[in-house]
Amino acid sequence: ESCTGGLIAATVTDIAGSSAWFDRGFIVYTPESKMELLGVQPETLNRCGVVSEPVAREMAVGALAHSNATIAVAVTGVAGPAGGTEKTPVGTVCFGFAVKTPQAVCAESSEQHFVGNRCQVREEAVKFSLKTLIALLS
């Protein structure tokens, strides 16, 4: 998690019994932490920008590589109120989803644009993450 700052992990661990299926979370707020903890490639960050689908995919794949999980979600975005650009305005959030099978790791990504203040953008990012995870598990 980047712009959500651990809110996804906090939300799922609010559920009693979540220790049976939740392994760990990574808060990687800076580009350096994304590289150090999740193995995001510097070239990807330089070429695509920190808020991008390729970075989100690499984050999700890295989360699987550094955990016992079989499914991972990654979030990187601009929650606001500052920090937006013309290319990535406030409310832009990129998601990476990775699933580990015995044969391979499959990853996909999505870019969403949420409207609202910082708290609302983060909450919408959590909702989108969890809805997508549920769909992937169904």
Task: Describe the residue ranges of each PLM region.
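Short alpha-helical segments enriched in small residues
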Residues: 2-138
